Design a protein with these regions (language model features):
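Active-site helix of classical SDR
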Residues: 33
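Active-site loop immediately N-terminal to the catalytic Tyr-X3-Lys motif
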Residues: 24-28, 74
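Conserved SDR Rossmann-fold cofactor-binding beta-strand/turn motif
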Residues: 54-64
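C-terminal helical subdomain
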Residues: 57-58, 72-110
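Conserved catalytic-site region of short-chain dehydrogenase/reductase
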Residues: 20-22
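A short helix-coil junction within the Rossmann-fold of NAD(P)-dependent oxidoreductases
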Residues: 2-8
C-alpha cells in the first residue's frame, strides 16, 4: 500500500464472501475470518480516500471449486467470479465499484 500511495494510484481488491452479509451454522471460523477482512477493507477504504488508491470488496456467493467436497454446477464458476473482478477493475477513477455482491441464482438464504 505505501508504494501505491507514493505513486498516487493503485488497487486493493479483496475477495470476501456473502457470509459477511448472511452466514450459516457450522462455518463460524470461516465467517469470522471473512468478516475481519471485510472490516479491514472498509476502514482501509476510508484511510486511503483521496490518495488515488482504490479499495474494492467482492462478495461472491457459492462457487463451484475443488474446495468443495461435492461438485455444485448450480453455483458460480471461477470464471464468473473472475468476470466480476474484471468488471470492478474496469471502473473509472471517478466512479468505481467499491463493493459488489454476486450470487448464483439458486442462493436464497439472503432474505
Amino acid at each position: 500500500v505505501p508504494g501505491m500511495q507514493q505513486q498516487g494510484k493503485g488497487i486493493v481488491l479483496n475477495v470476501l464472501s456473502t457470509v459477511c452479509l448472511f452466514s450459516n451454522p457450522g462455518i463460524s471460523a470461516y465467517s469470522a475470518s471473512k468478516a475481519a477482512l471485510d472490516s479491514y477493507s472498509k476502514v482501509l477504504r476510508k484511510e486511503l480516500n483521496g490518495t488515488g488508491v482504490k479499495v474494492l470488496s467482492l462478495y461472491p456467493g457459492g462457487v463451484d471449486t475443488e474446495f468443495r467436497v461435492a461438485s455444485r454446477p448450480d453455483y458460480l464458476s471461477a470464471e464468473e467470479v473472475a468476470d466480476a473482478i474484471l468488471l470492478m477493475l474496469a471502473s473509472s477513477a471517478k466512479a468505481h465499484i467499491h463493493e459488489l455482491v454476486v450470487r448464483p441464482s439458486i442462493e436464497t438464504n439472503f432474505c
